């Protein structure tokens, strides 16, 4: 494999980034490590590339400081690969590629906080059922309750929300969960909201609307890239499309809701999903 790193005196950041991440296989390896597939055999199965090529890419990503190799078995010797701070810094690149592919290559280029029911995004989200949410560096949306309802939303009152299909409704959605929080608790479920807004913005929103459950910031796009969640761009920010997951205490996604055309109706649907899962 030929790697072409930019000259140390080249002032172009893109050139330097391409030298580390420009190889397509390296990007897919980074995608899958971000998604919790940290062991060699897992990466072979997910990427479909040969073991020799995978070993080369992993060695290069470790050498460039994107991944760290950690031993998890002495006999036989086995290693897993985890993101370094540099690797986590590349997550917005993955999110941008995902959004570009969804919006411009698989879509018509129009920003949308929802999705067509027959879209690739819907297929990807529904495919999360049975998948475990990996441990993340900056946030953890999974609680110790039997179930956690994780609802992702674009962000309250973001610029241009009224011009984007599905953009309006974040405050109503959060307040509906607030008003029905006791019903979820009675079913052994907690509620967590996630957006890519900064923690300070979320704290102000929670205080103004008396939100009594966690609102978590995925500003660094860890959860977004781990689960390959659909996003769109608005107000100069990558924003999560409106989507909901029911997760069990083992971190496994048990049910999903996407797209969400009715924010208050989705809260009722989430209650129904928890109720059905509780009955086994």
Predicted features and spans:
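Short glycine/proline-centered loop/turn elements that form peptide/ligand docking sites
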Residues: 19, 36, 53-56, 60, ...
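Chalcogenol-based redox active-site neighborhoods
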Residues: 120-280
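Long, low-complexity, charged/polar intrinsically disordered regions in eukaryotic proteins
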Residues: 1-9
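Basic, amphipathic "hinge/linker" alpha-helix immediately C-terminal to the N-terminal HTH DNA-binding motif
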Residues: 22, 73-96
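Amphipathic alpha-helical dimerization/coiled-coil segments
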Residues: 92-131
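Canonical helix-turn-helix DNA-binding module
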Residues: 44-72
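N-terminal helix-turn-helix DNA-binding core of bacterial DNA-binding proteins
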Residues: 12-53
């Amino acid at each position: 494999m030929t790697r072409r790193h930019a000259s140390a005196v080249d002032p172009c950041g893109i050139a330097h980034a391409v030298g580390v991440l420009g190889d397509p296989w390296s990007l897919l390896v980074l995608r899958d490590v971000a998604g919790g597939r940290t062991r060699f055999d897992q990466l072979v199965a997910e990427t479909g590339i040969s073991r020799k090529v995978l070993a080369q890419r992993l060695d290069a990503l470790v050498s460039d400081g994107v991944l760290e190799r950690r031993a998890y078995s002495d006999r036989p010797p086995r290693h897993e690969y985890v993101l370094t701070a540099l690797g986590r810094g590349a997550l917005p690149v993955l999110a941008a590629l995902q959004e570009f592919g969804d919006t411009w290559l698989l879509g018509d280029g129009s920003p949308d906080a929802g999705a067509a029911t027959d879209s690739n995004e819907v297929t990807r989200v529904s495919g999360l059922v049975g998948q475990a949410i990996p441990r993340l560096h900056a946030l953890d949306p999974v609680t110790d309750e039997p179930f956690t309802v994780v609802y992702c939303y674009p962000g309250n009152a973001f610029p241009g929300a009224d011009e984007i299909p599905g953009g309006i409704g974040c405050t109503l959605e959060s307040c509906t969960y607030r008003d029905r929080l006791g019903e979820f608790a009675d079913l052994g479920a907690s509620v967590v909201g996630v957006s890519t807004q900064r923690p300070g913005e979320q704290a102000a929103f929670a205080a103004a609307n008396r939100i009594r459950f966690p609102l978590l910031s995925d500003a660094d796009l860890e959860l977004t890239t781990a689960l390959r969640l659909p996003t769109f761009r608005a107000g100069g920010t990558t924003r999560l499309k409106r989507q909901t997951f029911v997760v069990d205490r083992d971190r496994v996604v048990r049910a999903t809701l996407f797209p969400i055309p009715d924010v208050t109706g989705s809260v009722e649907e989430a209650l129904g999903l928890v109720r059905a899962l509780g009955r086994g």
